[in-house]
Amino acid sequence: MSFSVQETLFSLLQHNAISGHENAVADVMLCEFRRQAKEVWRDRLGNVVARYGSDKPDALRLMIFAHMDEVGFMVRKIEPSGFLRFERVGGPAQVTMAGSIVTLTGDKGPVMGCIGIKSYHFAKGDERTQSPSVDKLWIDIGAKDKDDAIRMGIQVGTPVTLYNPPQLLANDLVCSKALDDRLGCTALLGVADAISTMELDIAVYLVASVQEEFNIRGIVPVLRRVKPDLAIGIDITPSCDTPDLHDYSEVRINQGVGITCLNYHGRGTLAGLITPPRLIRMLEQTALEHNIPVQREVAPGVITETGYIQVEQDGIPCASLSIPCRYTHSPAEVASLRDLTDCIRLLTALAGMSAAHFPVEPDSGTTQEAHPL
């Protein structure tokens, strides 16, 4: 049966997986990888790794990765009344929290709830126009009191996810929670399906990582075992085709996958990625040869695992492919199935290249003469 991008994505979106609670998605990734990979394992932190391609010990090692976790919440306190206080896990958009429907993964199974908001009829002044902070909010699961909530399987530490089943919009767009980064996980499975029947010159490691939304470093144990020569991440990036962002950058939905030139943490440049120009050339040349649309991006405020991967070992050259996404970290993210398909095509083409085409070493300084100090 041929690989279906939409069916795979929608299947992954059915699962809930805040940081540190990725088991449901990990089980799917393990099952799919085991169909065709030469080697599959899950480390103690929860990362899922699948190896494809060359068995030669000196083969070039390309690592392609995406994270399984999504933004969400965690129960902090059960009030005597049965209402639940909670904390954010990762960075769910605070302006969309009040009034959202959520799913709690309780000890006895999923429990539906909603994030309460002061009744509009009694709201005054700023209460009608401003979003409350998380400490002013609560989750209502319909419990009569604290004991009732506990009987339902809820306790301190219960994970909470946003609820919004995937919907297909016009022009091959999809709307759902957790497109960040089930889009990337879908791309991994698409690449796995494509390369499983190819004769590869290199070894390809596909990695579904954990805790990206929480500490961005959950993938580190994989690096120390795989020791990749290059790494390419798959994640989302804000699409700037909406009325509020149309002047910010040229990244657009349905215009191809983004190639990151620069990203960094929104509160300073303490972590981020400046993609080596040689890797940008490799990605753009490969895309050109296979007629795959791509677009460059500079994305302050965006950070992925590449910011930490690049400084492991002797330095790991990193690139990041970004799937444009509207309304990021909200319950209703929107992205394009076409862009996702283009991402899979580009990564498959890269995996099929010979080792000689991968610029592992830095560019030489051939444009000016070097003099000793």
UniProtKB/Swiss-Prot annotation:
GO molecular function, one term: metalloaminopeptidase activity
Transmembrane segments: none
Entry superkingdom: Bacteria
EC nos: 3.4.11.-
Pfam families given in the database record: Peptidase_M42
Binding, a divalent metal cation 2: 180, 213, 329
Keywords, alphabetical: Aminopeptidase, Hydrolase, Metal-binding, Metalloprotease, Protease
Cofactor(s) in the UniProt record: a divalent metal cation
Catalytic residue list: 212
Protein name according to UniProt: Putative aminopeptidase SgcX
